[in-house]
């Protein structure tokens, strides 16, 4: 298979007008061997390697010679589109003479990513917003949401694929919920009047016949969390942008309790009550009100007794005593409502597809609410039950999927719980969230235990080693790895400059010295700067300070859509673009528009981030270094991604300037630098500014 793959790679590269790349050939060979010998593989492939071809060609060779497709999972929409709209069509054409059959490929996303024609047709209000939710929104929210829903209804009649990611203009999650359903809320294609036109069913049918199925990490997570198959049967998975896998899986497994969602659910349940039966949802509404009032009271009381003024905000290592009974009552009310609605015969709504769908949706939502309450209660007493009937039922409410729920819960293990008072139009939104401490066991058994998995990214070897990423995925240290390198000569094309003379970054914003340093660098570069900041406030403050002292246009994240800002930056060869996390990863601006990447500080996780805090403590308890395993690795990954924005083509040259002396003065600084591209390293500002002036003069 290996020699055949190299032949196919050569054919494809020649057809696409490219040139042979040693790193690409090395990666393609390793991927082919891993698929053939059925072992996992982690590959770091820097910018310019051509990693998508390096894994697609072995995947195509394996899939067209097998009855099973290869699943390719990505973190971002941009990469999914690149694969489906550019790479795979071109490869299908280039390789057609050498393949045993024409290549078939498809994209598959979760059902909730597609508009539901049945839900659109059965909208019950003028605003298009569900009645139960409509009554809880203030006029401005209702107006904005209603306008978006109206636009979605119009789009539903025009779209060819119903895919949310292909909307001409994005909408809020609240608006999208009015026109979509989850897989468990769907009444099924055979019972739905729009079954034959269903966008999700069409996408699933195309995927069932494909050799290569492109999906996202979220759907891959769902496929791992439930026993019912979501993706076509497969035995090989390619995970691109694998550095984001842990976070995406964690996000899917995170749940929350919010007063609004509980109240909406109770109203939805009440609307399903049939004549002569108790009103479903009454007890849930009362329990939700008691829980909300208790939470507000506990928050106010604890805040007044807390000299820091934060009270119960942040991580809970146990449920506050005054909240345990209200939370248990909410759990039991959710279960009772679930039983009430489940007890309504499906035949009751045989001629009403909208209510049939709503019945399933309420059953699913009450089950999830019950499970969330159980997770929060159990997180503070791992290994203990409270003896209640509902506790024994946790994860076993849905009958035909009980085993999957229990197994997934066991694999996710210990949970982390935290409370936030999110700001809202009508005052604070009191939200309690719960997330898994680790997803390693889930990945080990449900992903790696069932498939051959190839994981790849430009950033996997943190501190120069794969050890950290392997541990986060639940893979052993001896898992085969490969650093395919990059065709770019980082040392001769790029400079890493640390402004050691600046004061350490503090909480009071940018120092005068750091603003002056940034201005001198930007002026030397002639603009052409991508500013990566640790927070929105830091980006805004630096932009405000610099706009009075540099003669170049400074574009700021939040002042326009991200795509518009990046396009303006790309076209204007003297502009600067400042922003936060959205710019650290995925921004691709080759050429003369970018010669300076400015980083304000090492992007450690917030010290009050409950999940990161819990993971650090867990690492310490295992005898490791929580700071290095969690905080330093988090920072190293982002620093590597951020620095990787500089060299995007073989002709690019420039400077990565870090305004944080700790990258040089602290012990962990060397570890983070080893995670970054191998640029020439200096502490001399005059040398760097001279290099930037020469680049500006030659552009």
Predicted regions and their residues:
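A substrate-engagement module of RecA-like helicase motors
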Residues: 2-14, 67-211, 303, 336-342, ...
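A contiguous, basic/glycine-rich beta-loop/short-helix subdomain that forms a polymer-engagement track
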Residues: 177-211, 226-228, 337-502, 508-516, ...
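Conserved RecA-like P-loop NTPase helicase motor core
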Residues: 499-509, 560-664
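Conserved helicase motor "Helicase C" RecA-like lobe of SF1/SF2 P-loop NTPases
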Residues: 534-558
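Walker A/P-loop
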Residues: 37-57
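Conserved pre-motif I regulatory segment
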Residues: 1-43
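Conserved RecA-like ASCE P-loop NTPase motor core of nucleic-acid helicases/translocases
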Residues: 69-78, 454-456, 527-534, 657-659
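Signature of the SF2 helicase/ATPase Hel1-core->accessory helical subdomain module
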Residues: 55, 61, 81, 85-89, ...
């Amino acid at each position: 298979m290996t020699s055949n793959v190299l032949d196919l790679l050569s054919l494809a590269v020649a057809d696409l007008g490219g040139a042979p790349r040693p790193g690409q050939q090395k990666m393609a060979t390793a991927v082919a061997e891993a698929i053939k010998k059925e072992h996992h593989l982690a590959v770091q492939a820097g910018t310019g390697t051509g990693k998508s071809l390096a894994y697609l060609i072995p995947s195509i060779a394996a899939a067209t010679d097998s009855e099973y497709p290869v699943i390719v999972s990505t973190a971002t929409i941009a990469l999914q589109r690149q694969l489906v709209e550019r790479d795979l069509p071109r490869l299908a054409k280039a390789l057609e003479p050498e393949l045993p059959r024409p290549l078939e490929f498809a994209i598959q996303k979760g059902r909730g990513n597609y508009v539901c024609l049945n839900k659109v047709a059965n909208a019950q209000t003028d605003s298009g917003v569900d009645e139960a939710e409509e009554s809880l929104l203030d006029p401005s929210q209702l107006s904005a949401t209603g306008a978006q829903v109206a636009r979605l209804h119009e789009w539903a009649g025009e779209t060819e694929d119903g895919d949310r990611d292909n909307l001409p203009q994005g909408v809020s999650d609240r608006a999208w919920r009015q026109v979509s359903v989850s897989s468990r809320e769907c009444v099924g294609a055979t019972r739905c009047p729009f079954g034959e036109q269903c966008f999700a069913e069409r996408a699933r049918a195309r995927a069932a016949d494909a050799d290569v199925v492109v999906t996202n990490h979220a759907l891959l997570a769902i496929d791992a969390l439930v026993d019912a198959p979501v993706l076509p049967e497969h035995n090989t998975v390619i995970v691109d942008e694998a550095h984001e896998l842990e976070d995406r899986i964690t996000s899917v497994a995170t749940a929350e309790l919010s007063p609004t969602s509980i109240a909406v659910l109770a109203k939805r349940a009440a609307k399903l009550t049939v004549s002569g039966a108790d009103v479903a949802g009454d007890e849930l509404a009362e329990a939700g009100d008691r829980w909300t009032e208790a939470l507000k009271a506990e928050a106010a009381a604890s805040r007044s007794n807390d000299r820091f003024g934060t009270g119960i905000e942040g991580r809970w290592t146990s449920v506050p005593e005054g909240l345990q009974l209200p939370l248990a009552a909410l759990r039991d009310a959710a279960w009772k409502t679930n039983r009430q609605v489940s007890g309504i015969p499906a035949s009751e709504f045989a001629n009403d597809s909208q209510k049939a769908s709503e019945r399933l949706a309420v059953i699913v939502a009450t089950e999830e609410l019950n499970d969330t309450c159980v997770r929060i209660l159990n997180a503070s007493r791992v290994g203990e039950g409270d003896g209640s009937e509902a506790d024994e039922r946790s994860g076993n409410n849905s009958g035909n999927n009980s085993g999957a729920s229990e197994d997934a819960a066991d694999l996710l293990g210990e949970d982390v719980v935290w409370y936030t008072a999110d700001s809202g139009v009508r005052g604070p939104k009191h939200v309690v969230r719960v997330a898994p401490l680790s997803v390693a066991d889930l990945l080990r058994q449900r992903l790696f235990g069932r498939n051959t998995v190839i994981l790849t990214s430009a950033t996997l070897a943190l501190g120069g080693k794969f050890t950290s990423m392997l541990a986060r995925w639940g893979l052993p240290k001896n898992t085969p790895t490969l650093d395919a390198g990059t065709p770019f000569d980082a040392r001769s094309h790029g400079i890493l400059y640390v402004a050691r003379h600046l004061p350490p970054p503090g909480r009071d914003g940018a120092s005068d010295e750091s603003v002056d340093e940034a201005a001198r660098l930007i002026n030397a570069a002639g603009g052409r700067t991508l500013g990566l900041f640790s927070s929105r406030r830091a980006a805004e403050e630096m932009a405000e300070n610099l706009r009075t002292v540099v003669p170049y246009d400074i574009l700021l994240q939040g002042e326009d859509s991200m795509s518009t800002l990046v396009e303006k930056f790309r076209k204007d060869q003297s502009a600067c673009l400042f922003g936060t996390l959205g710019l650290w990863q995925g921004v691709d601006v080759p050429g003369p528009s970018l010669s300076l990447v400015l980083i304000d500080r090492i992007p450690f996780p917030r010290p009050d981030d409950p999940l990161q805090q819990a993971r650090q403590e867990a690492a310490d308890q295992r005898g490791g270094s929580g700071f290095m395993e969690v905080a330093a690795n988090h920072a190293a990954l982002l620093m590597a991604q951020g620095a990787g924005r500089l060299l995007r083509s073989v002709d690019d040259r420039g400077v990565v300037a870090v305004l944080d002396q700790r990258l040089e003065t602290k012990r962990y600084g060397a570890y983070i630098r080893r995670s970054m591209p191998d640029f020439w390293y200096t502490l001399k500002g005059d040398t760097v500014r001279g290099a930037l002036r020469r680049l500006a003069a030659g552009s």
